[in-house]
Curated annotation (Swiss-Prot):
Lineage: Eukaryota, Viridiplantae, Streptophyta, Embryophyta, Tracheophyta
Keyword entries, A-Z: Cytoplasm, Heme, Hydrogen peroxide, Iron, Metal-binding, Oxidoreductase, Peroxidase, Peroxisome
Compartment(s) where it occurs, according to its Swiss-Prot or TrEMBL record: Cytoplasm, Cytosol; Peroxisome matrix
Protein name: Catalase
Zinc-finger listed as a keyword: no
UniProt binding sites for heme: 348
GO molecular function: catalase activity; heme binding; metal ion binding
Enzyme Commission number(s) from the entry: 1.11.1.6
Catalytic reaction list: 2 H2O2 = O2 + 2 H2O
UniProt keyword Cytoplasm, yes or no: yes
InterPro entries, per database record: Catalase, Catalase_AS, Catalase_clade1/3, Catalase_core, Catalase_haem_BS, Catalase_immune_responsive, Catalase_sf
Function of the protein: Catalyzes the degradation of hydrogen peroxide (H(2)O(2)) generated by peroxisomal oxidases to water and oxygen, thereby protecting cells from the toxic effects of hydrogen peroxide.
Length: 492
């Protein structure tokens, strides 16, 4: 009998109950006792195993993006960008790559309502012929902070108060009053876009700046954008309360039901390109994650389409155990010196090893669909079948060679060690420009949300003044409206 033929799978279920080791269980209703009413015996192995397994069903919750839903499908190239990248999965129009996508809220717990004002995660895992490529983004194109050094503190401020376990505005506004770079992100979060109607009707963004490299080795900065074909729809406050009160999992249900009904969600992928030699020509730093690249001077280029046409088979196996990491790239795609991306490269893989163990990439949704080979052996929960005798490199008994070299960004870097801010902060221009694109009623809702947040009794006069000063620098009329309604004079 081949012990590897019947790997753990519901496809090999027996018609009767068994233990985890396969022994038949003739009674799954009653514990083993001394007589009818006597004490339970410790030798009741099935009972002990059943309880022990139940006690360990939960794994550590994601520190962010805990609440989410996943679906599977494909990505198809529709436009030729082979002159920009040598990535195999982007090699020509018509090429399809299987994907799994996870949508999520960011700050709140695993069972929290999907109608809370919060950014949404939009993570795509491409199972390419050259390994997995994880494009791990959000529904907003910018972020709160530009340096990953601030990320743990930022999350602590957004998370509930450690004393009361209640999310409180005064903590959020206190922290971000020290970081005017966050204004641009708040023009999205406190806008109508802050509560998407569901996952199907929201945009996605890679957020960080990456690098595309072609066969000749030419590198160009790139940003990725997902646009839903069914349009963008959001919930206003009253609608969110009504929808969330009826079903706290409404977005998960909408995604699942839509796919089940054959109404497959679809997004178009666009990119923006900047040549590294041109990065100093703008009034912002292209590697600053708090900035967008203006589409009027850096137009969107169509690339392909993402279609989700299959629901996951098991929520725990393909959502809770699904793990993304921005470090997972393929030839033709590389990182940039975006400070937030650089820290995400380490942090994501580290948290997955904590959550799922050192061999998390062996789990089915995380494992590559292409052949692969290395000497990363053993470790906790290693279930990969291996029969090699050589687990070192190099060896004449197992002459595994290096892969063909692929191009990486060519620049030579020089500089002194330092901890410093970027030169072009320019924190107020883009937030002001975005606010001025809002229709008057949309501006009014934005102002009302800020008045409500700044009216928190624990927000001090100093913090209110700082925020009004920030918004005045972004847009004078916005600052005046806030100052008037809060009866606070801005501190410039």
């Amino acid at each position: 009998m081949d012990p590897y033929k019947y790997r753990s799978s519901s496809a090999f279920n027996t018609p009767f109950w068994t233990t985890n080791s396969g022994a038949p269980v003739w009674n799954n209703n009653s514990s083993l006792t001394v007589g009818t009413r006597g004490p339970i015996l410790l030798e009741d192995y099935h009972l002990v195993e059943k309880l022990a397994n139940f006690d360990r069903e939960r794994i550590p919750e994601r520190v962010v993006h805990a609440r989410g839903a996943s679906a599977k499908g494909f990505f198809e190239v529709t436009h030729d960008i082979s002159h920009l990248t040598c990535a195999d999965f982007l090699r020509a129009p018509g090429v399809q790559t299987p994907v799994i996508v996870r949508f999520s809220t960011v700050i709140h717990e695993r069972g929290s309502p999907e109608t809370l004002r919060d950014p949404r995660g939009f993570a795509v895992k491409f199972y390419t012929r050259e390994g997995n490529f994880d494009l791990v983004g959000n529904n907003f194109p910018v972020f709160f902070v530009r340096d990953g050094m601030k990320f743990p503190d930022m999350v602590h401020a957004l998370k509930p108060n450690p004393k009361s376990h209640i999310q409180e505005n005064w903590r959020i506004l206190d922290f971000f009053s020290h970081h005017p770079e966050s204004l641009h992100m708040f023009t999205f979060l406190f806008d109508d876009l802050g509560v998407p109607q569901d996952y199907r009707h929201m945009e996605g963004s890679g957020v960080n700046t990456y690098t595309l490299i072609n066969k000749a080795g030419k590198a160009q900065y790139v940003k990725f954008h997902w646009k839903p074909t069914c349009g963008v729809k959001c919930l206003l406050e009253d609608e969110a309360i009504k929808v969330g009160g009826a079903n706290h999992s409404h977005a998960t249900k909408d995604l699942y039901d839509s796919i089940s009904a054959g109404n497959y969600p679809e997004w178009k992928l666009f990119i923006q390109i900047i040549e590294p030699d041109h990065e100093d020509k703008f009034d912002f730093d292209p590697l600053d994650v708090t900035k967008t690249w203006p589409e009027d001077i850096i137009p969107l280029m169509p690339v392909g389409r993402l279609v989700l046409n299959k629901n996951i088979d098991n929520f725990f196996a393909e959502n809770e155990q699904l793990a993304f990491c921005p470090a997972l790239i393929v030839p033709g795609v590389y990182y940039s010196d975006d400070k937030l991306l650089q820290t995400r490269i380490f942090s994501y893989a580290d948290t997955q090893r904590h959550r799922l163990g050192p061999n998390y990439l062996q789990l089915p949704p995380n494992a590559p669909k292409c052949a692969h080979h290395n000497n990363h052996h053993e470790g906790l929960m290693n279930f990969m079948h291996r029969d090699e005798e050589v687990n070192y490199f190099p060896s004449r008994f197992d002459p595994v060679r290096h892969a063909e070299r692929h191009p990486i960004p060519p620049p030579v870097l020089t500089g002194k060690r330092d901890r410093c801010m970027i030169e072009k902060e320019n924190n107020f221009k883009q937030p002001g420009e975005r606010y001025r694109t809002f229709a008057p009623d949309r501006q009014e809702r934005f102002v009302c949300r800020w008045v409500d947040a700044l009216s928190d009794p624990r927000v001090t006069h100093e913090i209110r003044s700082i925020w009004i000063s920030y918004w005045t620098q972004a847009d004078k009329s916005l600052g005046q409206k806030l100052a008037s309604r809060l009866n606070v004079r801005p501190t410039m």
